[in-house]
C-alpha cells in the first residue's frame, strides 16, 4: 500500500529540509546512511528505524556530469567530509551506506566513490526505483529531474517494470538562463536558486521539453499516478505544467522534492540491510 503523501511523506521531507546542514535530531533507534551523488549537489542523509530523517549534509558541487563522476577526488573529499561531520555530530561510526545511480549508467561509479571514502556499500539501486520503493507505489510513474539527467520509472504491482534516463535536467536550465542573461554558467546556477519566480518564462520551454520526453516514455503504460522528484522540480510552475500536460493522471509534487531521492536512498539501506547500521 502506498504511503500517504500528506501524513507520511510531507512531514519527513519538511524535517529533512529543516535539518539540512543543521544540528541533528534526537533518535534512540539504529541509524542508516544514504549518499546521493548528484550533478549539482551531494547529499548525505541519516534516517532512523522509523524512516525519519535525523541528519542531513548538503554541498552544492560540480563533481558528476551526465552520470559520470568527472571529479573523482572532489566527490570522495565531499563524502568523506560529510561522513566526518555526521559521525562527530551523532557520536557514532558509519561503516556502510546506501547509494544510487542514474538508470542506464554503471552503478560502480557511485560505489567506487563511497568505497574510496572508507564506506562499504550496503545497497545500490537506480534513483527512480529508490523513490518508487520509498513510496510503495503501484501502477505509477516516477520522474526524477536532477541536475544533469531525468530518470523515469514505471511501477506495476510494486515492481519497476521499466526505467530510462535522459540527459536533460537542471544543468540545461542553467545553460538556458546563462544564454538568456548573458552571464557565466556558475552565476546562472546561483541566480536560478534565488530568482525562481522571475526566471519561469525563460526556462519554461526547457521543462516543456522534459514533459514531452516523459510523455514518450510513459505512453501506453496505463499508469494512474505520476510522481515528480528531484531538486529541479522545485521551480515554481513545474507542477502546473505537468498537470496541464498530463490531465488524465494524478500528478504529485511533494514539498522539498530536493530531498526525496536522498530520503529514498537512505531508506533503501534501512529496508534492504537491516543489520548494517551505525555503531
Swiss-Prot record:
- Its domain of life? Bacteria
Record note on disruption phenotype? Not required for aerobic growth on ethanolamine (EA) supplemented with cobalamin (vitamin B12). A double eutJ-eutG deletion is not required for growth in the above conditions. A double eutG-eutH deletion is not required for growth in the above conditions. Slightly attenuated in a mouse model of infection. A non-polar deletion mutant grows on EA from pH 5.5 to pH 8.0, but does not grow at pH 8.5, no change in acetaldehyde release on EA plus vitamin B12.
The protein's name: Ethanolamine utilization protein EutJ
Q: Name one GO biological process term.
A: ethanolamine catabolic process
Q: Name one Pfam family in it.
A: FtsA
Family the entry assigns: Belongs to the EutJ family.
Specify the pathway: Amine and polyamine degradation; ethanolamine degradation
| NCBIfam families on file | EutJ (TIGR02529), PRK15080.1 (NF011660)
The induction text for this entry reads: Part of the 17-gene eut operon transcribed from a single promoter, induced by ethanolamine and adenosylcobalamin (AdoCbl, vitamin B12).
Q: Briefly, what is this protein's role?
A: May protect ethanolamine ammonia-lyase (EAL, eutB-eutC) from inhibition, may function in assembling the bacterial microcompartment and/or in refolding EAL, suggesting it may have chaperone activity. Overexpression of eutJ and eutS in E.coli leads to multiple BMC-like structures; eutS expression alone leads to 1 BMC-like structure per cell. Expression of the eut operon allows this bacteria to use ethanolamine (EA) as a carbon, nitrogen and energy source. It relies on cobalamin (vitamin B12) both as a cofactor for the ethanolamine ammonia-lyase (EAL) activity and to induce the operon. EA enhances bacterial survival in macrophages in a concentration-dependent manner, suggesting it is an important nutrient during infection.
Q: Does the keyword Signal apply?
A: no
Cited CDD domains: ASKHA_NBD_EutJ (cd24047)
Q: Which InterPro entries match?
A: ATPase_NBD, EutJ, FtsA/MreB
- Keyword annotations of the record: Chaperone
Amino acid at each position: 500500500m502506498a504511503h500517504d503523501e500528506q501524513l507520511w511523506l510531507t512531514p519527513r521531507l519538511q524535517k529533512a529540509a529543516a535539518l539540512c546542514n543543521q544540528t541533528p535530531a534526537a533518535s534512540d533507534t539504529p541509524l542508516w546512511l544514504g549518499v546521493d551523488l548528484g550533478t549539482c549537489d551531494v547529499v548525505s542523509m541519516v534516517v532512523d528505524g522509523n524512516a525519519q530523517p535525523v541528519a542531513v549534509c548538503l554541498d552544492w558541487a560540480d563533481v558528476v556530469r551526465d552520470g559520470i563522476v568527472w571529479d573523482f577526488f572532489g566527490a570522495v573529499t565531499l563524502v568523506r567530509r560529510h561522513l566526518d561531520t555526521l559521525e562527530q555530530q551523532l557520536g557514532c561510526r558509519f561503516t556502510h551506506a546506501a547509494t544510487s545511480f542514474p538508470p542506464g549508467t554503471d552503478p560502480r561509479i557511485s560505489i567506487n566513490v563511497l568505497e574510496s571514502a572508507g564506506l562499504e556499500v550496503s545497497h545500490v539501486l537506480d534513483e527512480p526505483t529508490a523513490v518508487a520503493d520509498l513510496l510503495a507505489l503501484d501502477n505509477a510513474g516516477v520522474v526524477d529531474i536532477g541536475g544533469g539527467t531525468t530518470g523515469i520509472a514505471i511501477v506495476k504491482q510494486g515492481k519497476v517494470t521499466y526505467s530510462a534516463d535522459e540527459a536533460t535536467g537542471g544543468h540545461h536550465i542553467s545553460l538556458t538562463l546563462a544564454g538568456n542573461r548573458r552571464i557565466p554558467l556558475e552565476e546562472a546556477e546561483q541566480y536560478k536558486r534565488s530568482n525562481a519566480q522571475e526566471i519561469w518564462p525563460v526556462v519554461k520551454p526547457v521543462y516543456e521539453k522534459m514533459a514531452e520526453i516523459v510523455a514518450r516514455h510513459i505512453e501506453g503504460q496505463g499508469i494512474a499516478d505520476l510522481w515528480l522528484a528531484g531538486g529541479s522540480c522545485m521551480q515554481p510552475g513545474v507542477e502546473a505544467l505537468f498537470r496541464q500536460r498530463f490531465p488524465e493522471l494524478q500528478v504529485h509534487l511533494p514539498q522539498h522534492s530536493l530531498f526525496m531521492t536522498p530520503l529514498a536512498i537512505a531508506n533503501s539501506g534501512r529496508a534492504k540491510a537491516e543489520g548494517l547500521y551505525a555503531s
